[in-house]
Regions:
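A cross-family acyltransferase "interaction/gating" segment
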Residues: 12-24, 52-155
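A recognition module on extended beta-rich or small alphabeta surfaces enriched in W/G with H and D/E
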Residues: 137-182
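Short helix-terminating capping/connector loops at secondary-structure junctions
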Residues: 1, 51-52
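Conserved beta-strand termini and adjacent loop/short-helix elements that scaffold enzyme active sites
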Residues: 8, 29-31, 117, 147-149, ...
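Short, hydrophobic/aromatic alpha-helical segments in well-folded domains
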Residues: 6, 42-45, 101-104
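Exposed, interaction-prone extracellular/peripheral surfaces
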Residues: 105, 181-184
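A Trp-anchored, charged/polar loop motif used as the substrate-binding/catalytic surface
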Residues: 36-48
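Catalytic core of membrane glycerolipid acyltransferases/transacylases, capturing the structured
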Residues: 1-37
């Protein structure tokens, strides 16, 4: 498999990601770009010409999740689109997706299926302090779940954002159920 990644531009501060990441067909997205159309066009170009043995990977949330980031993201969504905020209101673990980048990738490769993936077990490992706290506890098993969705079952245009939100709400519920199960063992 030959992946093409969409990564946030801030990751270029890591010398390894800067050197290796720029030698491969990846795109480092400027999430604060004044003109997002340039960034979205680059994502369409990145996905153009994907073959059956290649994959484009995007993290629709845009960054690692935390309660503070989730609250801030939901606040922004509520200001712009109250109906969407209502759809996403029950999420407890994942950040809401930002659909424009995913839609741009799919526009670039209209025949590609979609894989929705989520995981548990890395919670709290996003800071050095979190790693130290995690070392003092019984380790949780890492679990990764992925689901392939035939492209014919993925809506286009305005329906895509609603569909992606639904996928994220389902994934958030699955994460919650798994964490509840692990907490009761």
């Amino acid at each position: 498999m030959n992946p093409r990644y969409v990564l946030k531009k801030e990751l270029l501060f890591d010398p390894c990601l800067d050197i290796v990441g720029n030698r491969l067909p990846n795109y480092f997205l400027d999430r604060a770009a004044a003109d997002s159309s340039v960034e979205l066009a680059a994502l369409r170009t990145l996905a153009t010409g994907l073959t059956d043995d290649q994959v484009a990977v995007i993290f629709p949330e845009g960054t690692r999740s935390s309660a503070k980031k989730r609250a801030r993201a939901m606040e922004k969504i509520r200001e712009r689109d109250p109906a969407r905020a209502d759809r996403l209101a029950g999420m407890q673990h994942l950040l809401p997706p930002r659909p424009a980048g995913s839609a741009a990738l799919l526009d670039g490769c209209p025949a590609a299926d979609v894989i929705i993936a989520w995981h548990v077990g890395f919670d709290g490992l996003d800071t050095f302090g979190g790693i130290l706290r995690h070392l003092a506890r019984r380790p949780l098993p890492v679990q990764f779940h992925a689901r392939r969705i035939d492209r014919a079952d993925v809506p286009t245009a305005d329906g895509f954002a609603v569909w992606l939100d639904e996928m994220w709400v389902q994934s958030d519920r699955a994460v919650h159920a798994l964490l509840q199960q692990e907490g009761s063992e």
